From Swiss-Prot:
Keywords: Cytoplasm, DNA damage, DNA excision, DNA repair, Excision nuclease, SOS response. It is found in: Cytoplasm. It comes from Clostridium botulinum (strain Loch Maree / Type A3). The keyword Cytoplasm applies. This is UvrABC system protein C. GO terms for cellular component: cytoplasm; excinuclease repair complex.
Length: 618
């Protein structure tokens, strides 16, 4: 039995970290303290200064524990690590632990590559970023590959080494084949220097040079070459447009501000690299209530830079708590000096004001959209409750479906809707293991049995304090189950629920002869629903989603199997050649279309294996 009064009296007057727990033993808050005794006791003292969030948290505290550290900076580091590990309910939590993508030029290599990475290390490479949108990094790298003939392979290529046969990229003009020693290191570096100029925003010089070459080609009646150079100029200008200079300095800086409306807060981050905005990101944190902005920003920085891959030289904020301590922590993580600054006037202050305006607009738009969706979903759940005569609104709904082709690779899927919205983090997939052939009823019985067996097992582990509630994958049961089918599927579900003595209403989602959602079956009767109403739209959405999720899983399994069988059936093609073929040709279709010469261009292929591939796909 935890004696709260005794534990409060015996708190040490040393720095450390404290962990608040609820009645399930789940950690709901992690904090650091310069003096544990003073900080922890503050929570249990009646005070008007406590925010609504703190008051709500204290009501849920059943016990606490603490860890003593040697210094406040050690406490801060431990706090960040524990928050990342436990994801406590009452800490500021960003939706994901983002490691933003960078473009990496591997300058430590004799013949550098341009690749995407989410990890910045001191390895002699040059990094550009971070980019908020991962797809934009992919697009930029693809555009660079089309414009500059640089290698894309992972081979360890050294100048003067033994030459090897170049791959297909050389034959189609996408690479200068340093592997075959067709280009000198110094010549290749000139190409890489242009890539670096482009990524640094100095693309105008490159464009000018390309234009001169284009005009020269046109004068010499080399129209195909001129057209190719024109296309490359368009690509370079497209990349250059992605980044706009707003400052004349060349520092790496982040600008962070926030806007609160009294209940929720939006944080906005602008990333400036070499004087250009390379991206921005926003985070909505709900239920911050009247927490002061300096505390919010301090907590946000710990969460944001505790997870992100890159810490800039300077971070600008409107105000902050524990500034010196956070600077020390950031510098330790970065392994070089990082500074937090609060601009009072000038262009830095103007940028920070712009960030705040963006945060305000983002929060207002979020609230407007949220309120509109909430009103819509609330009405749907209310109508669903009335149509089915349920005791409560079905806040959590789980839908199940089976997918197979002629009995092979049977899979089951479970999708979840909470408060009317899809919750993909709770979706689950089941590979059918006990059923032979195409038997949807037995397959459905298997996945439902597994789902509720897991759930009951997790609930017991939570009750025995062997599992935290937030770690459970099946411990939350639905208020309503929707089966993708009629009475047969409903009866299977009810049979499984009765086995476990679980009482949950079960409906069947039925379709017409044109495979369109027709309505619901409940308690043995089909319920007439307005086909143009919001409930019908919602049911259709659930049915489409569970079917899509099952089909996508089935396709992935089927794809793996067909991929495997096709390649493994080709004589003289082992694991090494199989990997090389896929790496160079990207797909089975491309391998089918490959010529004898193209197959031979793969280093691991010889005449015999190339002939085997051609013969197999003849």
């Amino acid at each position: 039995m935890f004696d709260l009064e005794y534990q409060l009296k015996n708190l040490p007057d040393k720095p450390g970290v404290y962990l608040m727990k609820n009645n399930l033993g789940e950690i709901i808050y992690v904090g650091k303290a310069k003096i544990l005794k003073n900080r922890v006791r503050q929570y249990f003292q009646k005070s008007q200064k406590h925010s609504e969030k703190v008051k709500a948290m204290v009501k849920n505290i059943e016990e606490f524990e603490y860890i003593i550290t040697d210094s406040e900076i050690e406490a801060l580091i431990l706090e960040c690590n524990l928050i990342k590990k436990y994801r406590p309910k009452y800490n500021i939590l960003l939706k994901d632990d983002k490691h933003y993508p960078f473009i990496k030029v591997t300058l430590a290599e004799d013949f550098p590559r341009v690749i995407s990475t989410r990890k910045v290390t001191k390895d002699g490479s040059k990094y550009f970023g971070p980019y908020v949108d991962g797809s934009s990094v992919k697009d930029i790298i693809e555009l660079i590959k089309k414009t500059f003939p640089i290698r894309t392979c992972k081979k360890n290529i050294v100048e003067g080494a033994k030459a090897i046969r170049p791959c297909l990229n050389y034959q189609i003009g996408l690479c200068k084949a340093p592997c075959a020693q067709y280009i000198k290191k110094s010549e290749y570096r000139e190409i890489i220097d242009d890539v670096i100029k482009l990524l640094s925003g100095k693309h105008l010089d490159i464009v000018e040079n390309f234009k001169l070459n284009m005009e020269k080609a046109a004068e010499n009646l080399e129209f195909e070459k001129a057209a190719m150079l024109r296309d490359k100029i368009n690509i370079i200008e497209k990349i250059g447009e992605k980044q706009k200079i707003i400052l004349n300095n060349f520092d790496n800086e982040d600008y962070i501000s926030l806007y609160s409306d009294g209940k929720d807060t939006c944080f906005q981050v602008f990333f400036l690299r070499n004087g250009k905005i390379v991206g921005r990101e926003h985070f909505i944190i709900e239920d911050t209530f009247d927490t002061n902005s300096s505390t919010l920003i301090s907590n946000f920085l710990k969460e944001f830079y505790g997870g992100t891959a890159y810490i800039p030289k300077t971070i600008y904020v409107p105000n902050i708590e524990d500034e010196a301590l956070l600077e020390q922590w950031l510098t330790l993580k970065k392994e070089s000096k990082s500074t937090i600054k609060i601009p009072i006037k000038g262009e830095k202050k103007n940028i920070l004001d712009l960030v705040e305006k963006n945060a305000k607009t983002t929060l207002e738009n979020f609230k407007l959209k949220y309120l509109q969706e909430k009103a819509l979903y609330d009405n749907v759940l209310k109508d669903l409750k009335n149509i089915l005569s349920l005791q409560e609104e079905p806040i959590r709904i789980e839908a199940f479906d089976i997918s197979n082709i002629q009995g092979f690779d049977s899979v089951g899927s479970m999708v979840v809707f909470e408060k009317g919205r899809a919750k993909p983090s709770d979706y689950r997939r089941f590979k059918i293991s006990t059923v032979k052939g195409a038997d949807d009823y037995k397959s459905m019985k298997e996945i439902l049995t597994r789902r509720f067996q897991h759930g009951l097992s997790e609930i017991k582990s939570i009750q025995d304090r062997k599992l935290e509630f937030s770690s459970g994958k099946f411990s939350v049961f639905p208020d309503l189950i929707l089966m993708d089918g009629g009475k047969g599927q409903i009866n299977i579900a009810l049979e499984v629920l009765n086995t476990f003595n679980i009482d949950i209403p079960v409906c069947g989602m039925v379709k017409d002869n044109k495979h369109r959602t027709r309505g619901l079956i409940y308690n043995g009767e089909e319920i007439i629903i307005n086909k143009y109403g919001s409930v019908m739209k919602f049911i259709t959405r659930v049915q489409d989603e569970v079917h899509r999720f099952a089909i996508s899983y089935h396709r992935s399994l089927r794809g793996k199997n067909s991929f495997h069988s096709l390649l493994d059936d080709i004589p003289n093609i082992g694991e090494k050649r199989k990997k090389d073929l896929l790496f160079n040709f990207k797909s089975i279709d491309n391998i089918k279309k490959a010529t004898y010469e193209e197959l031979l261009s793969i280093p691991s292929m010889d005449k015999k294996s190339a002939e085997s591939v051609l013969e197999f796909f003849k």
